[in-house]
Amino acid sequence: MFYKQDWILRQIQMIGEMISMAVFHKSIIAYENENVVSPTQTDRLYTRLDMLVANGKIGEAEDALFDEIDPDDPKYLELALDFYQKLNRLSDAELEKYDFPRQEILDGMNTLVELFGLSDLVK
């Protein structure tokens, strides 16, 4: 089981890095609020996702992400990559505690790839 989890963790990292380099020309994605005084829709979603994850509601956070995501706006891709990279940094014990297996993170990353038309990057 440990090897499978480790393999999934590396797959998530690799997919995130490939998308980051291809789309944003940087190896690490960290979403940054565009305007603290007048937050954008992605800024508000980012804050909401962070609060949900902090309260252990990871599944609800992922649902909110996909409810609001706009595949025509690269800011949503940046936000989603940041979201999944943060989840991937959680320990297996934390993910298990919140009933969110690491495989779901990989599934979410693969859904992003499809939504944003990036399948050719991740073959």
List each language-model region with its residue ranges.
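Short acidic/histidine-centered micro-motifs embedded in hydrophobic/aromatic stretches
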Residues: 67, 82-83
